[in-house]
Structures are given as structure tokens and as C-alpha cells.
Design a protein with these regions (language model features):
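Small beta-barrel nucleic-acid-binding modules, primarily SNase/OB-fold domains
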Residues: 2-170
Length: 170
């Protein structure tokens, strides 16, 4: 009986530790450098030590494509926050295109969250994301911020826009 309690206690401890670790954000590395390019509303280039350029895709968000409504404004918003600034990237590793996927910080500002809060990007729910972004998106939507002020037929999530373009171009 005493041995059974010890085993059950050990299993419980392992389970608790696994749950705690599972809830922690995983960061492959942290990068620091100057933002030297903004490609669109969710992709930038960071100049890091050794004069190396790293293309960074902001994790957990998806901004309108440049060719869709609000795409240029999303790029301008990211540029206003980040271009020329010293940034820190908490990287989650590469995406399927080889870009560094990560959360961008300018000082204490979480740029990914700021873009969602301003209504210039959607939360990208295709992949695991920070649930706090959901609340920021709801706030932007409810207040009519950014792209949420567009007519409903112009508020097409980028992942649907890209899919539609693939069908048309095919």
C-alpha cells in the first residue's frame, strides 16, 4: 500500500511537471538586431551581429496580403513600430519557408500583440498561438479599429485570400 502511494505520488509529480513545461513558451533562440526591412504587415528583416540579415515572420498573427484591402496599411503599421529600431526576437524556429518565426519586441512592446490590438492583423489560428491575442483581436473588432472598420466583404482573412488566389491562378 505504501509503495503504491509512492508510485502514484511520483506519477502525479511527473504529470504536474509535464503540464507546467507544456504551458511554457518554447524559444529556439533569442535574436537581437536592427530592423532594416519591412516586407509586409507580418514579415521583416533583422540585421544581426556579423552583418547577417534574418527574415522574420511574426508568430501567431497574419496581416492582410499587400494586394488585399488594408495590406499596405498593415505594412505601414509594422514599419512605424519597427523600422530602424533595435529589436529582440524570441524565435520559435524556422517556418516552412525558412524564415525565422518569432515574437518581436521593440523595447517592452510586443509588436505582434500591438498589430493585433491596432486591428491591422488577425490572430493566426491555423497554428498554436498565444490565447491573449484572441482578447486583443476581440477588442479591436468591437471598437472597429483598423481593418475592422472595413465593410464586411473586404475583411477577408489572409489565409482565405491566399487560398482564393491559388484557385484563381490555377
Amino acid at each position: 500500500m505504501d509503495m503504491t502511494r509512492r508510485i502514484a505520488g511520483s506519477e502525479l509529480l511527473v504529470l504536474i511537471l509535464a503540464l507546467v513545461v507544456a504551458g511554457l513558451p518554447v524559444s529556439a533562440e533569442t535574436l537581437a538586431g536592427r530592423v532594416v526591412g519591412v516586407h509586409d504587415g507580418d514579415t521583416l528583416t533583422l540585421l544581426v551581429e556579423g552583418n547577417r540579415q534574418v527574415k522574420v515572420r511574426l508568430a501567431g498573427i497574419d496581416a492582410p496580403e499587400l494586394s488585399q484591402p488594408y495590406g499596405q496599411k498593415a505594412k505601414q503599421a509594422l514599419s512605424a513600430l519597427a523600422f530602424g529600431q533595435e529589436a529582440r526576437i524570441d524565435s520559435a524556429g524556422p517556418d516552412k519557408y525558412g524564415r525565422t518565426l518569432g515574437t518581436v519586441y521593440i523595447g517592452s512592446i510586443n509588436v505582434n500583440a500591438a498589430l493585433v490590438s491596432q486591428g491591422v492583423a488577425w490572430v493566426y489560428r491555423q497554428y498554436p498561438h498565444n490565447a491573449a491575442l484572441d482578447g486583443l483581436e476581440s477588442g479591436a473588432r468591437n471598437s472597429g479599429a483598423g481593418l475592422w472598420a472595413l465593410p464586411a466583404n473586404q475583411r477577408v482573412p489572409p489565409w482565405e485570400w491566399r487560398h482564393g488566389k491559388e484557385l484563381i491562378e490555377w
